Swiss-Prot record:
GTP binds at residues 44-51, 111-115, 165-168. Pfam families: EFG_C, GTP_EFTU, GTP_EFTU_D2, LepA_C. It is a peripheral membrane protein. This is Translation factor GUF1, mitochondrial. GO terms for molecular function: GTP binding; GTPase activity; mitochondrial ribosome binding. One of its GO terms (cellular component) is mitochondrial inner membrane. It comes from Debaryomyces hansenii (strain ATCC 36239 / CBS 767 / BCRC 21394 / JCM 1990 / NBRC 0083 / IGC 2968) (Yeast). Promotes mitochondrial protein synthesis. May act as a fidelity factor of the translation reaction, by catalyzing a one-codon backward translocation of tRNAs on improperly translocated ribosomes. Binds to mitochondrial ribosomes in a GTP-dependent manner. PROSITE patterns: G_TR_1, G_TR_2. It comes from the Eukaryota. Keywords: GTP-binding, Hydrolase, Membrane, Mitochondrion, Mitochondrion inner membrane, Nucleotide-binding, Protein biosynthesis. It catalyses: GTP + H2O = GDP + phosphate + H(+). Its EC number is 3.6.5.-. Belongs to the TRAFAC class translation factor GTPase superfamily. Classic translation factor GTPase family. LepA subfamily.
Length: 636
């Protein structure tokens, strides 16, 4: 038999084996009643072992084989694996047979992001679950994100099972972690399950606890279809893939769906479960967390928290609660390091935005840096992850301006306006705009720190215009601090400073606290009177003198000498608040003259002096992009 025929036979055999396997999985699901479904999530602080625990559960239920090749299975993005964080919500179905009753259960693990920037994805993931594992590092104890995510899960009615992880470490303090669970969350210490996700120790105790304590979904296959959109991503071959929680009814291939938010219709091209990758099914039913391919080409139509109905059977149905559009809170200007690569970079940007509908993208032009974009993100980590993905996946080099936050202008006639670009913020003509009030966004920052650093951290918060709201002593030397802080201060590497003054032992989480009236102004960096738009910043008036001095001193380092004097000024409302001067580069016009030719020497020096005056009045400073790049990189 020829090699081609052999290969064709093998392909056919693999295809038949795959079809047979999928059919057996479908038959297995069909036999499991909805009362034996369990949908759960894992609540954890960054780096407490959530993705590793997910891997162990998938191994225990036979979804994946043990081994290094299957590390962090649910973290699909390179940046997720590198940073050890989860950015996109993922899911996986698992089968489990109770060794005593011999009953089979269908488990859906929804792996959620832990960081505050991705709170919308976290809350929608929780909405598809009946309970969650509250994961705590035995060596670090309860941290800020554990507390914040606990309250979010608790407020949504989830049943929480405390799991103490990393008990294999020498620094593990299991009694302390149990005490913190009892005092901070008011959960019985007897409910705590001590495990090591790394070694697999005691992992087998988790699933029986999930089956016993977490309630099954309450939906019905006989009711009209209602499905909650948990997450989505863009596939270059099939378009948008949506991760859904089927609350009621059944979703089948070929069914017409209707979005409650946009009222657009879609045809289901494919439906299936994640096991751990996409596995097509004939249908998915109430209680399941599954994927569908709806023939959607524009990912921005897939809004997290949206409800989908079956078209034609949607009359009188109410959408599921909790829908909210993502709201960018941090904005940056982005420019290609090489201006000639704008078109190519624009394609890369648009491709990345396809997979992240929470990023806003608008083209903008800078006098200093040329063509670029104004990008809106959920937070600073979100911006950093986006930049890393751009560099890792496309090899793109990009310049980011200093992050800014959305400021609110309240006009005398009651109208409101949001400003996200510092260059568009009102300056000296503030009153001419009929502006009644300026407001900036605040956040409630939640920090856990060792008590020995409490004085240092409180000083840091107060220096960043923070207002203390709460102070609570946890067990064994840990303190929980709550401060109200302007978001603008938080995005300026507040977390880096917090880590620095606590030797890395602090943790931080925050939530939106709305807008407050503030004395904020626009500071422009001018070179010989010309404002440099890429370097314009908005700040509180109390920071103007120190920031102004810092900026002009630093920018002076990156400017080349000119043949005439150059003034670098920081201006607020057309008033100079700081200045540095680059002295004129001296050119010896008398070097060829005889020492005795005094009148000729005077004439040449006088002409040079007049020429420098004229150059200063009419000459333009040539500032190369490297100067801007170096300044912004250091500012970043």
């Amino acid at each position: 038999m020829s090699m081609k025929k052999t290969a064709a036979v093998e392909d056919k055999k693999i295809s038949l084996d795959k079809e047979s396997y999928i059919k057996s999985v479908q038959e297995r699901i069909a036999k499991i009643p909805i009362s034996n479904y369990r949908n759960f999530s894992i609540v954890a602080h960054v780096d407490h072992g959530k993705s590793t625990l997910s891997d162990r559960l998938l191994e225990l239920t036979g979804v994946i084989q043990p081994g290094d090749a299957n590390k962090q299975v649910l973290d699909k993005l390179d940046v997720e694996r590198e940073r050890g964080i989860t950015v996109k919500a993922q899911t996986c179905s698992m089968f489990y047979v109770d060794p005593k009753s011999k009953e089979e259960y269908l488990l859906h693990l929804v792996d959620t992001p832990g960081h505050v920037d991705f709170r919308a994805e976290v809350s929608r993931s929780y909405a598809s679950c009946g309970g969650a594992l509250l994961l705590i590092d035995a060596s670090q104890g309860v941290q800020a994100q554990t507390v914040a995510n606990f309250y979010l899960a608790y407020s949504m009615g989830l049943k929480l099972i405390p799991v103490i992880n990393k008990i294999d470490l020498d620094a593990a303090d299991i009694p302390r972690a149990m005490d913190q669970v009892e005092t901070t969350f008011e959960l019985p210490r007897e409910d705590c399950i001590p495990v090591s996700a790394k070694t697999g120790l005691n992992i087998e105790n988790i699933i029986p606890a999930i089956i016993r304590d977490i309630p099954g979904p309450r939906g019905s296959v006989d009711k009209p279809l209602k499905a909650l959109l948990v997450d989505s991503w863009h596939d270059p071959y099939v378009g948008v893939v949506m991760l859904i929680h089927v609350v009621d009814g059944v979703v089948k291939k070929g069914m017409k769906l209707l979005s409650a938010h946009s009222e657009k219709r879609y045809d289901v091209k494919e439906v299936g479960i994640m096991y751990p990758d996409k596995m097509p099914m004939d249908c998915v039913k109430a209680g399941q967390v599954a994927y569908i391919i709806p023939g959607m080409r524009n990912p921005r139509e897939a809004m997290i928290g949206d409800t989908f109905y079956q078209y034609g059977k949607h009359e009188g149905l109410e959408p599921l609660p909790g829908f909210e559009e993502p709201k960018p809170m941090v904005f940056v200007g982005a420019f290609p390091a090489d201006g000639g690569e704008f078109k190519v970079m624009n394609d890369h940007m648009e491709n990345l935005v396809l997979n992240d509908r929470s990023v806003t993208l608008e083209k903008e032009t800078s006098n200093a840096l040329g063509l670029g974009w104004r990008l809106g993100f959920l937070g600073s980590l979100h911006a950093s992850v986006f930049k890393e993905r751009l560099e890792n996946e496309y090899g793109a080099k990009i310049i980011l301006t200093a992050p800014t936050v959305p400021y609110k202008l309240i006009f005398k006639d009651g109208e409101e306006s949001i400003v996200t670009n510092p260059d568009e913020f009102p300056g000296a003509d503030f009153r001419n705009h009929n502006i009644e009030m300026l407001m900036e966004p605040y956040v409630n920052a939640l920090m856990t720190i060792p008590d020995e650093y409490i004085g240092t951290v409180m000083s840091l918060c107060e220096n960043n215009r923070g207002i203390q709201k709460e102070l609570e002593y946890l067990t064994t030397g840990q303190v929980l601090l709550k401060y109200e802080i302007p978001l603008a201060q938080l995005v300026e590497d507040f977390f880096g400073k917090l880590k620095g003054c606590t030797k890395g032992y602090a943790s931080l989480d925050y939530e939106d606290a709305g807008y407050k009236k503030s004395d904020i102004v626009k500071m422009e960096l001018c070179v010989n009177g010309e404002p440099q738009d890429a370097l314009t910043q908005v700040m509180h008036r109390s920071q103007v003198l120190s920031r102004g001095k810092e900026y002009v001193t630093r920018f002076k380092e990156y400017l080349k000498f000119q043949l005439f004097e150059v003034a670098i000024q920081a201006k607020v409302n057309n008033k100079v608040v700081a200045r540095e001067t680059i002295k004129a580069k001296r050119k010896d016009v008398t070097q060829k003259l005889h020492a005795a030719d005094i009148s000729r020497r005077k004439k040449l020096l006088s002409r040079q002096k007049e020429g420098k005056k004229q150059m200063k009045a009419t000459g333009k400073i040539s500032i190369n992009q490297e100067a801007y790049q170096a300044f912004l990189r250091r500012a970043d």
